[in-house]
Amino acid sequence: MRKAASIFLRACERRKDMDNLIYWLKNPEVTRFLNEDAGVISYLSRLADTVPEPMLPFHLNTMGRFFMICLEDGTSVGFVKLAKTADADTYEIVYAIGEDTLWGFGYGEAAIRQTLHLAFEELGIQKIIAKIDPRNERSRRLAFACGFREEQTRGKYMQYAASIAAT
């Protein structure tokens, strides 16, 4: 695999970020394996149209934490979401490199590793799960490479988990 350029995570705080999210979520190649609500594009469009830029992170972080995956120059190329679950110590991670021309360069792995560090070391989260479609071999390999282990089947998804105890 080719080596990825450095990436960093930041809050979704710009109108351009919202435009990118909406664009990515309209791409069937990007969303083919995502488990997102059908109304998410409408919700994001409404936020982009009505919420001032400084308030975007507040709205996107109401149910967990939301980050843009950015190249060194600040260009957003994907996102990571840590969503609260019914278990207070567990969050679900959802991730996507929205720029499909950048798939296979290691950006996803770098983003997941940074997210795990942030979650475990800075936010005090104890466990993170990822629900992955079994057909999504790339995402399954990524989860294993980042320390997730197969936990159980939940509907049409396999659930993988990483915990502070296992890192």
Where are these regions (language model features)?
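Short loop/turn motifs at secondary-structure junctions and domain boundaries
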Residues: P57-T62
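Terminal output helix/cap of sensory domains in signal transduction proteins
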Residues: E53-L56, L116
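Conserved GNAT-fold acetyl-CoA-binding loop/helix
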Residues: E29-E53
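Acyl-donor (CoA/ACP) binding surface of acyl/acetyltransferases
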Residues: M1-R32, F66, C70-T167
